[in-house]
Structure formats: structure tokens, C-alpha cells
């Protein structure tokens, strides 16, 4: 305490004005001594670990996005200050003075507010609450505030004016360019971003525009490169209510009150007598003059707005937000047109149309001949590849799903077109129609498609990439030409040089600013550095801006590598995020159609069609649509001073692989640039101000030491409370735990042969964790279905799906992420449960299991008994009902295969629909009627247990084959049921012996003796008291009951849950007498050594089946309990069938756990809960997911850390992380 009081007498680092104010304040009031005692004492390092050093923490700060922004802002501000200080515009100079004045006043007001609120403690609160977070002292607070004002003001000035002009080589900027001049494609290189009336040889106010215009130009370069923006000319014909009513198209018995929508897309027919320019008549005019809207000279596309149901015009589609902003069908169709212009189209029907059907209903353009359910698609790499399913055969789909319907989905012409299932007149005709969602249109057979006709949720769109024919070609995207074209359109709108019938609103630099605002300072630095490197003349050569220019060059020399590497990394990450939205938004688009199938209302999908874009079965990405995004990555990579790549990617790699390789490669560049920069600054720790609780740093080796030191401190402030830095501390515990490292390779995240377990054993833990994560995903179909495209097996491979999910986490690279710490915590819990001969697992299970209630290992699957299986043909099932339903109705296949051992290929349509194949997956999965996707979670047993084999398997003597059983829920107790359905949980714990079982006569389906295999002596009460283990344990339990409430609980469990007719217990007697009576009942009824006469006497009390109440029950539980599947009756709950397999365990089983439990060569399953090794490890894996077990394990990790708790030297970090992980220096 004495030393600390001495330290707080250090002088506060203030300006001369602040010093006088501080003296007056101290004279008026002194802080409370307890307030001072409670202050955190900063040290000279952030933690006592190597990665807690000053430099290591600064590395983290400058790799962190917010930390980098804070740092670069303070480095940018002094550069811009030179622009303000030497400016000839008095208004700009005055702005700088105003910033300083406003900042001074703001500080005074803030200080007074704290004085009023905290009185004597206000100086402490000023330091801890305000100054510690803003550079450490008053001078830095003010410098930071002024710097932020300078940066904000300069950026606002950047976009005040529109500098897009036509620049004649002879006369300069034309004040009023002619329409014909700028529409000439050969003149587009004269359209520039250039300020008017500037003169580099004079000191003029107007010369400031040269600064703004030059920076605008570079920001536009960034925008065009990073966003790949394309203007799309389009009109829409919105969905209509037909004049003759929906009932003439769709069956009103099935489709009640349809509304105009994508599914029920109907348009009124063309009427030659109607002079309207909207709807079908407008479409007729449009289709008759289609190619007149495409200018073959300058490649512009202008479609008259008058035909559109909305205002028409053009839309700017950008990589970052088009799938958020627009209908995903529309955005995907745009990409299709974009790729078609580069001959990279893979999605549209192979036939590219030169004309439209204009004399009928608009929708009929999407009815195509259906000689085959498959139509060829063009490949991006080879026009000879034709493998993609595209046409949607509605007749086939409805036929497969609606054999029980006596009426057609369609009526009138639609019925004729699609030859619906129950239409016998032409259902087998070769000329019935299928439906598509998109058509490519071209002028003639010798040209590329330049227009797209596409269906969307709001109507039908005719669209084309405006100018795409100019800057897109087979060799790719020409970014410079794309920029020229956008400037051409921007110049048109600026000067109103647009035909009145094709007007549109296009504010190019509003879009540029929107892109710029995402990363303002980093992008501005990048633009300034590009200007330094530019060969074109710009403001940097103006004598008027010499000081400003020199400061840009100086800071470029210091920050170039840092800015360039971080710029690339941020752009790569944003493009990756944008591309991920493709699968996500298309999944959202498809979900209602899948739901209709799942909910037995497939007819509600109406005219919905599969989008013509293939989903990669393995990754879930749409690789062809990803070409659009891959182009951005390539352009950004090539647009740097050091574009040499060590990436393993090839040009043919899909985006999903290329982006991962690029991010990994560039991450190393970021780390190297950050380390080099920080090390060169030779940062040191400086004394903390009075009352401060933080570490402050300083550098003398920068071109601007004061602002650089402030920048470093603000970067630290941003990162010290971040998850990333906290996770660095947490990770330190894991990587320094010797036992954990013996089990896990923490660098590669692979498993070692620890505790007799091999890699295959360890994978059970990995995939259990991933499956739990998979179940929590809102759109799991975005991870594909795990099917290898070269495989002939069309079943989903769940491990392949989980691998895709694991790859998306990118844990090997994200070492400070929450995802990694969560995975570490789980794996450590596994290791903690298994170490020391399973001591911790044993203790936890002893606490989890109870003597007084049964516990089970449970496998459970569920199915809607009325749910149709839309892929029944693929499953070779004649009926449309699900396999589970067929079994429940005792019409299972002749092999009598156990349902819980059948892999559910697509439970609850989790991978979409194979009938429609909405994701257009190359290897669609077969639908399953199972509701519960836990059917994908399987365990293996070695087949040695006779009760787990079917009769067929027994007769074939297949006792050594490893069997799979699906729907594993692990250890289930009455208080921990692991998401079991209510019906299953109630059957196990509140009606293990049901009244129907008890009252059923011999020969009834529920009485077990009549349904067992020959020689079976099982009873309906088998296992009822298995939790007690023996009669002796039951008597001990009764003896040890201390209260009436506990006795009542046991009594009610026996009589209500187990349906045992307990006799001889007078509930009005004392607790001791009731206990004695219950023990007498137990001894006389549950003792296997009693005489035959006693057993015969017991039959009169309906308790004749008590001889095996302490035996383990293992088998199927439904309306009956049986160990043989052939006699099993499913558990029913309203519309749901449940297939349940259960195995009892008790505390005696737990007591057997020990050193031999993990021995794969030991066939004695009694040492591992009577389970195979694989089943046992799956059980442990689920226990490791338990939050309570993880908490215990992490507490043990921290408590046993060989170096004790991590010591922290800065209050910001100490306050951010839980105190269980750290202590003060």
C-alpha cells in the first residue's frame, strides 16, 4: 500500500492550461482513500506470457480490424492536417481552428460533468473512465478528438462534388458535352474524373478540387475491382390475377384462394384489340422489337421503361449486397447473363433462343418441350458437357407424390401442358411440357446471349448486362473498360443526356462512397499510395500541396506493406462473406417449396421450378455462380505491387477452395508486415499517469512520434477487450497442459494414439461435436450433402457434410477465435473424462445416475405416420408411405430389417428434396420421412449381443458383423433427457410399465411373454427396479430414507411410474412403520429365492411377474417392450411414430469403469456400460458436450495450470476476461 500511494503522486501529463486546472481541482477535493486502494496497478507487460509482451500485443492490435482502424486514423490525420494548415482556402483553415476550439470546450464540459457527479473522486473517474481509453492523458484526448474531426471532415469533402467530365485532348473539360459524342464508344476513354479550372502553377482555392477528384478516381478503381458492379437494364411484368380467374388454371379443391405469386404465376393472354402497353400487350411489343434494344455498336442495352410494371430503368448489382437487396433468383439470373457474355455460362438450357413466344401468355415462354425429364446444360469449361438436370417435369413430380389424389393440380391449358398425373389422355405423350425458370436470348445463332428472361417472385424479368458486351469477353473482365462504361453512364445522368423513354437513376459516387465507408481510412490510405505510384499527373506535383504531398510519401514508406496486406485481407474476407450468401439466400428461396413437400402439400408449389445452377454436393457452394466472385479475387490479387502468389490454387479451382488458399497466403503477409512495422518502431513502456490503470507505450522512431504513439495506444485500447486477445489467454492454458498435448496435436488439430485410442476412435469425438453444431445450423443444406460426385451411391455421407462444416470453421488459421476455444473446451473435456482410468467420468456418472429412478442408453427415431416419401421410386418402395410407417403397419419388407439400423438418407429433408432437387445438386439425396435428423447420428456395436440382432441375423449367425444403430441420444435420466421427444421420455420414466401392458391378457400384443422368442422368460416388469441393482440395495435405500417426502417419492414411483400394486403399507402410520411395511413387501415379492407356493400366491395380487425386476432390460420400447424387433409395436404420439431402442444402466455398471474400459481387445463389455467400444466412446462424446461437464473440466484445467493463473498487467484486459482465468500482477 505504501509503495502504491507513492506511485499515485506522479504528475499528470497535461498541457499548460490543464496543469493549472488540475492544481485548483486537487486543492478543492481529494479522492477517497478507498477509491485509490481499489485501483488496478498497471505493470510493464500485458500478461506474464510470451504472447503478452508489449510487441506481441501490438501485433494482435494491428492485425485486429478495429485496432488497425484506430491506428491508421491517427496516422492519417497528421497527413491531412498538412492539407488544412497550408490551404489557400481560408474556410478550410478556419475549420481546423474550429476543431481545436470545439475540442477544448468539449473537454471542459466533460470534466465539469464528472466533477458534479463524482465530486472528490472526479479526477480518478476522469482518468479511469475517459483518459485511460483515449490515450492516457488530456493532451492525447484532445489530439485524438481533433484528429477524428480532421479525418471526418476531409472525407465529407471528398464526395461533395461530382467530377465526372468529358475531357477533350485539345480543349480540356467540355462544359456541355454532346449526346452523340459521349455515346460513341471510341470516346469513352475521354470520360474522366477531373476537376475543372485547376492550375497547378497557381495557388488557387479551386485546386483543392484536384485533390478530391484524384482521390475519387482511385476510390472508383477500388469499387470497380472489389465490387464488380454491373448495371442491369430491366423491365418486369408483375404477377397478375387472371381475368378468367385462378380456378381456370389451378384446381380449387387443392389450392384455396391463390394469390398472384411465383408459384401461381398466371398472366392474361395477348389481346390484339387491346392498345395497352402493359402486361401481355406490352410484352408483345417488346418481344417483337427485342434486338432493337441492344446497341451492337457500343454494347449498351436500353429497354423502354413504359413496358415495365414498375418504373423500369437500370439496377446496379454489386457483389457485396445483391443477394441481400434483390430476389436471389434475379441476382442469380444476372450472374448467368454475366457469365454467358464470357462464354462461361453453365446453367441455362443448352438451347439459346433467338425469339420469344409473344402471342400468348407471358408464362408460356417457360413451358418447354419435355421429351426427356433432363435437358442438357453447357459447361463453363466445355460446351460438350451436358449433365445438369434443368427442366422441371411437373407431371412426374405430382405423379410421384399424389397417387392418392383423385383430382388434378392443374386445370385448363395448364393441365394440357403438363399432362398431370391423373390425366390419362396424354400423360404418356412425348410432347408434354416441362417448366424452366430462365432463358438466354441472343440475336442470332452466331452471337452470344445478351438478354435473359427470368422468373422471379414478383413476376417475369427481361434483363441484360448493360455494356457487358464491351467489357466482358471470353478472356474475362476488363476492369478499365468496366470503369469507362460506368463513367459513361454517370456522365449521361449528370448532364441529362438520356432518352426520355429509357431514363434511369444512377448515382455512381453514392455507391462508391457506400463501399468506401466500410473501411474508410484503410481505403483512403490505399488510394493515396496508388496516387504516389501513378504515372499520371495529379495534385502531388502541385507546388501548392508540397507539404501535404511530402507527408503522404513519408507515411507511405512506413506503412506501405501494412496497408497493402491488410487491404487485400479485408477485401478477400468481404468477398468470401458475399459469396457465402449465394448458397444461403438460395436455400432460403428454396425452403418454402421443401416445406410444402414435407408438410404433404406439394401441390402448393404450383409452377415452381428448379433454378438452373448446380450446387456442389461436397461443399454446398454454387461453383458456377462463384466464378463471378472468383474474378474479384483474381483482380485484387493482381492489383498489388507484390502479386507473386505461393497459393496452391489453380485457375480451375472453385471459389470455395481459392478463397481459403488466398486468405491463408495473405494472412502470412499481414503477420509479416505487422511484425516488421512494430519491431521497427522500438516501442517502450512509459510511466502511467496518476490514477491510471493501464499500460501506455511510446515510440521515438516514427516520422511523427507523437501521433504514432497515440495511434499505438488507441490500437491497444481497441484490442485489449476483444474476444481475440481474451482467447489468446484461454488458449495458453490448453497448449501448456501436458496431458492435453499428449492426446491432441494442437497445431494440426489431429489426434494422437493416447489412452489406447487410435485415430478412428478419436474421430467419434470430432464428428459428434460437429454433428451437434450441424443440428444448430439455420440452413444446413449450405454444407452440401457429402456425396462424392464420382460415387454411384446417392446416399448422403454425413461425415462428408461435417467435413464441409469443419472446413468452414478454418480453425487451424483462426487460433484466437471463439470457434477454436469452443472446440478446445470440448476436446479437453473428453480428455478430462477419460484420463486417470476414467476417474472423472465415473464420478460424474455416479452423480448423474440415481438409485431411485432408472437410467437408459437410448436410440430413438421419429416419423410422421402420414408423411409421403417423395422419392419412393429411388428407394424401391411401392407405396408412397415412409419405411417407418410401413413397419408400423406390419408391412415391412420381407427381410424384416430393424428400422433403427437403417440409415436415413435425408431425414426431415435436411438436405433438401430429391424429387424437385431444389438445390440442383449434382448428386441429389433421397428424401426420408423421418422427422428427426438425429437419425444421422449412429453408433456401432460389434454384434456380440444377441438382443441387438434381428431374427434374420441370428439365423444367419452373423454375430461378428459390426452393426450400426441410428438416433443415439446417449445416457438419459429423468432429469437429463437429451432432447428426447416427450412421448419417449414419458414412456421411459413415468410409464415404464404401462397400464395397457399390465392389463393385457396373455396372447395380447402388449403382454411380453406371448411375443418373445421361444424360451424367453421376460416379463413386463423386467428392469423396473434395475436402478437399485439388487434387493439388498433396495432395502438399504428404504432404510436410509430420512423424510416422509422422500418416502412418498419412492412409493409414488413404484405405484405410479412402475404400476406395481404395493400392498401392506398403511400410509397413515409413522414413517418408520411405513418403511418397515415397504421392506416386507419387497422381501416377499422381489426375492428370487422364494418358493413356488409363494409365487403362486402372488399371482392373486397381479404381481406375478416380479421375478426379474432387478434384471437389465435391453430392447425396443413402444406400446410393448421386446428384445426382438419382429414383435415390436411402435410408440405412437398423435401423428408421430417413434422407434425406440433402449438399454438400462445403473450405478453398478458405472462402478465397473476403469483402466480396461478403453481396451479394444477386451471383449468384456461390462467394463464399459455393457457397450461396444464405439458405442461407449459415443456416450463419452455426448457427455463431453454437457455444459456442466465442460465447466468442471475447464475449472480443473485452470486449477492445475503448472504456472498458475495468467497474470495481467492492464485493467482493460483484466476487466474484459472472467477472473477465473487471470490474476493481477
UniProtKB/Swiss-Prot annotation:
| Presence of the UniProt keyword Lipoprotein in the record | yes
Q: Tell me, according to the record, the phenotype of the null mutant.
A: Probably essential, it was not disrupted in a global transposon mutagenesis study.
Instruction: Name the keywords, alphabetized.
Output: Cell membrane, Lipoprotein, Membrane, Palmitate, Signal
Q: Lipid link (N-palmitoyl cysteine) located at?
A: 28
**What is the recorded membrane topology of this protein?**
Lipid-anchor
Among InterPro entries, the record links this protein to: DUF3713
Source domain of life is Bacteria
The coiled-coil regions, if any, are none
Fetch the Pfam families from UniProt: DUF3713 (PF12506)
Identify the main location. membrane
Extract the signal peptide range: 1-27
Stretch list, region Disordered: 995-1014
Can you list the GO cellular component terms from the UniProt entry? Answer: plasma membrane
Where does it reside?
Answer: Cell membrane
Lipidation (S-diacylglycerol cysteine) occurs at 28
Similarity comment: family membership: Belongs to the MG307/MG309/MG338 family.
Record's protein name? Uncharacterized lipoprotein MG309
Organism field: Mycoplasma genitalium (strain ATCC 33530 / DSM 19775 / NCTC 10195 / G37) (Mycoplasmoides genitalium)
